[in-house]
Amino acid sequence: MASLGVNIDHIANIREARRTVEPDPVPMAMLAELGGADGITVHLREDRRHIQDRDVELLRQTVRSRLNLEMAATAEMVAIALRVKPDMVTLVPEHRQEVTTEGGLDVVAQLSELTGMVSQLQTSGIPVSLFVDPVASQLRGCTDSGARWVELHTGRYAEGSWNDQPHELARLTEGTATARAMGLRVNAGHGLTYQNVEPVAAIPGMEELNIGHTIVARAVVVGLQQAVREMKALIQNPRRDPLFGQALG
């Protein structure tokens, strides 16, 4: 059964839209945990467009589940992670003009650089996950880097047409199996919603789904705790086949 990591970046987005102090993502993380979140995920971007350094520092002190820090593969971010010591670091690609992360890391092209960073972090007791597309060559690169986890990019599945989704779901299923055969542990995320999460949650070997925007959007209507409860229920009892998205049973 997959667990749920709640990404609270979009709470910080609301705050930063007015350059004010509310809503504060730190107490919101507590509400997410009360709603059943198995972990809290934040992305500290180089441009600090939403999550700020003080958020990460305070979340490290207050999160009672797991704190997953998403970050670019830079010396600055590695230094922050080594100081804060989150429960996991997920290295992600980052571009200044993007609205959100647009694809997976090119681990093959960046293997030497990533290997050094993975070693630094894991030597300090911080497990590292690499955010990648479900492609065998990239998964092999993850293994070569020394990383113990991958997070599969679900964007093509989540944003695909009705006709494309079964194919993209099959890629995620095959990618999960391939990664596990290589000794990697598997998370997934990007663009998952209440409407499309169940087939991904049902993939054998899937350990955690990191989900943010849809939960925060739902929270506007029902509150954050209830929004998390509803997503957790879908993940714990997925009702659709992981290959074809059809109802189970």
From Swiss-Prot:
Its EC number is 2.6.99.2. Keywords: Cytoplasm, Pyridoxine biosynthesis, Transferase. The active site is at 43 (proton acceptor), 70 (proton acceptor), 190 (proton donor). Homooctamer; tetramer of dimers. GO terms for biological process: pyridoxine biosynthetic process. The lineage of its organism: Bacteria, Bacillati, Cyanobacteriota, Cyanophyceae, Synechococcales. Pfam families: PdxJ. It is found in: Cytoplasm. The record marks 151 as: Transition state stabilizer. Its main location: cytoplasm. 3-amino-2-oxopropyl phosphate binds at residues 7, 18, 191, 212-213. CDD domains: PNPsynthase. GO terms for molecular function: pyridoxine 5'-phosphate synthase activity. 1-deoxy-D-xylulose 5-phosphate binds at residues 9-10, 45, 50, 100. This is Pyridoxine 5'-phosphate synthase. It catalyses: 3-amino-2-oxopropyl phosphate + 1-deoxy-D-xylulose 5-phosphate = pyridoxine 5'-phosphate + phosphate + 2 H2O + H(+). Pathway: Cofactor biosynthesis; pyridoxine 5'-phosphate biosynthesis; pyridoxine 5'-phosphate from D-erythrose 4-phosphate: step 5/5.
